[in-house]
Amino acid sequence: MTAIPVKKKVQVSFVIRDEKEPMHRSGVNCLQYDAQTGRLFSGGSDTIIRIWKSPDRKDDSGSSYSVGGKTRVRRDLHLQSMEHHTDWVNDIVLCCGVISASSDTTVKVWNAQKGFCMSTLRTHRDYVRALAYARDVEMVASGGFDQLIYLWDIATLTKLTALNNTVTTSSLTGNKDSIYSLATNPSGTVVISGSTEKVLRVFDPRACQKLMKLRGHTDNVKAVVVNRDGTQCISASSDGTIKLWSIGQQCCISSLKCHSESVWALQVDSNFSCVYSGGRDKRIFRTAINDFKTAQLMFIEDAPVQRLQLIDSESRFIWTATWNSSIKRWPLPSDAQISVEIKSDQYGETIPSIHEPDLTIPGAASIRQHVVLNDKRHIVTKDTDDNVAMWDVLKGRKVCDHGKRPMEEVIKDHFKKVFVPSWFTVDLKSGMLQITLDESDFFSAWVSAKDAGFPNIQNDTKINYGGMLLRALFEHWSRSFSDVDEESPTHRFNSVPGHTPLILCESTGRPIFRLMIRDAAHETESQMLSDFVPPWVLDVVERNQLPKFNKMPFFLLPHLSLGIKTPKKDRLSATEMLQVRKVMEHVYEKILNVNDASYSENGIPSAAQMLSPSLQANIEERVELYCQDQKLDPEMDLRTVKHFIWKQGGDLMLYYKPIR
């Protein structure tokens, strides 16, 4: 018997952002420098790879201003952004172009000159954390949380395209835990991995064989570098130590604990004569490899250090990437200028050799807090600069800025006593708002046209937020249904900005396809959407079909003040979107107006006694409706009454009282 493959659940996500994002929005995870072009490459938690000019120390051209003396802040260095990842960019290497590794589980090959993704490798099944490049043999190794290392031939990768990206790869197996670091020498004779297993594993990539394990660390190995001939390596660990190893002797030659916390980043010079280290304690140390007992404190960053990039040329620099969104360049003194003597201030703190960077590439603030308002359409956020803003999910854009105003005040000012079910989720991992729509609850947000802010539409018209948003996200797609009348629940009252990234992904977050929504009009993207768009999206976008309203049972009883001993208890069922006004009309027409007598059989005054049988618009002047002894607003819907007033399980109990 052949098993029927289970079709994976597909979600739809989009990111609310500016059209151009020239600055990193969150922490910077990786750096690479191209000495031939003088360009710096950076990858960040905001999913974007950026390319920067790296000016010479004497180059004062461009827009810059000073901070704290000699530091120049340059806002004119951004050259290009490369976007196609959907999660953190964890590592990049420069070869024929750029190869990147991401927490979206993919490895991507880029044309750096034109700035586009040539192909996507989906071999890894979990976060891809590290890359290593063997320059002389044109090989790249990738490792991640799936405990596997894959070897890639660069010549093969450069021939791949977005539609033809099938490639054969070899793998190195044996790791028992998530891989956080990788290193290889230029000739590709060894590949070394560090992981949460607390050991270094050494492989021969030519034969795809394990060679040895190097034991000694007591925590995760976060960084590894290896010398040119593959005989020595240096590792950095969350245990706070850096260790020098002999691969031939399979032992630790020396260990140094100059850092007070985890060590995350290493860089060695071209001669493998000194190593620079940085980590959680924000301090960058320089250690001579032939004297692995002492380290000089070079400088102190203002946030934990994630990556270092040494520029080992005539003008020596080191670039730093931290938890902050800015990137800094620190000028390095010559070896002769570095004092072996450790100097301390009056409090006993070690004085760094370099007091400030000479150049800063500024970053932008990232969103760190959010609250979805109870209208389930607007979101209030606070960023790392304490700026508060409000966003409209339906329009995919910012509504207004509130500056440094307390977030709680803004939320209170925009509170509405209306209940709308949750129909999307919010993720801030990129420092920007990412909205995810799931089949299970996406269609649950039915609201009246009035509550949705469309006063010109008939009050009885019901709007489906999910359907409206889907139509806006896919409006450029050729298969999108366009003949929608004004009172349709998915009528396109607004459009989402064309630059908005749209992502189809599995429920695990693993991406299937990413594009800018305006590009859905292009033939290639349109065809790929046809291959990947799930049926629940097609129902709305292509066929304009929506699920029916949810039904809500409730009881109607005469108010206790009427003194009826054996009241009739009517159990009714209606859409949860039904307004209280409609229930009042039902009471007036069907329950109170039973005959023309002065009093009906149950002792309640008949409607005919009060006024003519024809129902007037002001029903609130004829009937009152109560729940939990609270008089109900005729404009409320049953869903809101149950959420804000009934506040318990079981069927809703409503009590009517005629106005005498």
UniProtKB/Swiss-Prot annotation:
Coiled coil: none annotated. This is WD repeat-containing protein 48 homolog. The lineage of its organism: Eukaryota, Metazoa, Ecdysozoa, Nematoda, Chromadorea. One of its GO terms (biological process) is double-strand break repair via homologous recombination. GO terms for molecular function: ubiquitin binding. WD repeats lie at residues 23-78, 84-120, 123-162, 174-213, 216-255, 258-297, 300-341, 362-401. Gene3D superfamilies: YVTN repeat-like/Quinoprotein amine dehydrogenase. Disulfide bonds: none annotated. Belongs to the WD repeat WDR48 family. It comes from Brugia malayi (Filarial nematode worm).
